[in-house]
Regions:
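Long, contiguous binding/interaction regions
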Residues: 2-120
Length: 120
């Protein structure tokens, strides 16, 4: 399983208030979620009028498919005409690597009372 994460800035032209910015950002995030069935959120520059930092996450069983999905999502976000996509950063994380201790370790405790080790 491959988790693909993208973080990018969206430069917003002519935005005069945080309320206006939040409305535009919410529209972009909702449309991306609906079209691509992904996780998306505003992750930075929360108090900046003219810029938003957005984060996206997708999951797939193949690295190439994950890369293509993120490319399509970023092109689509740019095509909405709300702002200019800038400063794109992408990371692909193979979940098998995390299970082998090469990623961020978990606490080993399942919040639902089970064991994470059972997932290996």
């Amino acid at each position: 399983m491959i988790v693909g994460v993208a973080r990018f800035s969206l430069r917003l032209e002519g935005v005069r208030s945080l309320k206006e910015k939040r409305g535009q950002v919410r529209t972009v995030l909702d449309r991306l979620r609906q079209r691509f069935h992904l996780s998306a959120a505003e992750v930075g520059a929360l108090d900046a009028h003219g810029r938003a930092e957005l984060g996206l996450a997708v999951v797939s069983n193949e690295r190439a498919h994950t890369e293509r999905m993120l490319q399509r999502v970023l092109r689509t976000a740019a095509s909405y005409g709300v702002g200019t996509v800038e400063d794109v950063r992408v990371e692909l994380v193979p979940m098998g690597e995390l299970a082998r201790g090469r990623g961020i370790p978990s606490s080993g405790r399942d919040p639902f009372g089970g064991s994470w080790a059972a997932l290996d």
